[in-house]
Every structure is written in structure tokens, then in C-alpha cells.
Design a protein with these regions (language model features):
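Generic low-complexity, intrinsically disordered sequence content enriched
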Residues: 8-10, 22, 69, 78
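Short, charged/polar N-terminal "headpieces" of proteins
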Residues: 18-29
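Short acidic, low-complexity intrinsically disordered linear motifs used
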Residues: 1-18
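Acidic, low-complexity, intrinsically disordered interaction modules
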Residues: 28-89
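Short acidic DE-rich linear segments
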Residues: 4, 97-105
Length: 105
């Protein structure tokens, strides 16, 4: 059996998935930083997302980008766009540019 869903319904599914990740979010004077968990933050682990108010830009770690793309069968650019849309619901300022470190290794 096949189901047809709208793009907004699909985005909402991805938003719920991202909400369930329970990122550890910290606000600072220039924006927000998200880690995979509080434990990752406490151990000095890698940042998952950084949203910078002054530059109006947001960094998304390639691990999250690839994870969302893989789970939901998205192209990387589409994954970045939907993660970006979700991030906008989590912060209190607008972002003009989203980027990732994908392929930087």
C-alpha cells in the first residue's frame, strides 16, 4: 500500500525526528550552539549546530546532515534545507545562510 503525503507533512515528520534527538542547546551572546547531548557538551565533544545572530548564518555538522539524508532518502541539499527550517523554529532570529562541513575531510 502506498501513501501520498504533502511536502509539509513530510517536513513535519522530519521536524518530529529532530525534536526527538533532544539536542543540548545553549544560548550565548552571538546565537545558539547545539550538541548531540549534555554529556557530549560536558566532555568537549563536537558541536552539532551553531547559529550565529551577527552573521545570520548557521553551521550544521555533516554527521547530522548525512543522518537525516540517509534516514529520509533525501539529497544532501534537501536535508540541509529541512534541517535549516527546523532550526528556525528553535531560535529567536532569522538565518540567511546554512552550510555544512560535508566533504571537508
Amino acid at each position: 500500500m502506498k501513501y501520498l503525503i504533502t511536502e509539509s507533512q513530510f517536513d513535519n515528520i522530519i521536524f518530529k525526528y529532530l525534536d526527538m534527538q533532544n539536542f543540548y542547546k545553549m544560548r550565548y551572546d552571538k546565537g545558539y550552539v547545539f550538541w548531540e547531548s549534555k554529556e557530549v557538551w560536558e566532555s568537549g565533544g563536537n558541536i552539532t549546530i551553531t547559529a550565529n545572530r551577527e552573521r545570520s548564518e548557521c553551521f550544521v555538522n555533516s554527521d547530522l546532515l548525512v543522518e537525516v539524508a540517509s534516514i529520509f532518502s533525501l539529497e544532501l541539499n534537501d536535508s540541509l534545507n529541512v534541517i535549516g527550517a527546523w532550526i528556525k523554529t528553535q531560535i529567536d532570529f532569522d538565518i540567511a545562510e546554512f552550510f555544512s562541513d560535508y566533504g571537508a575531510d
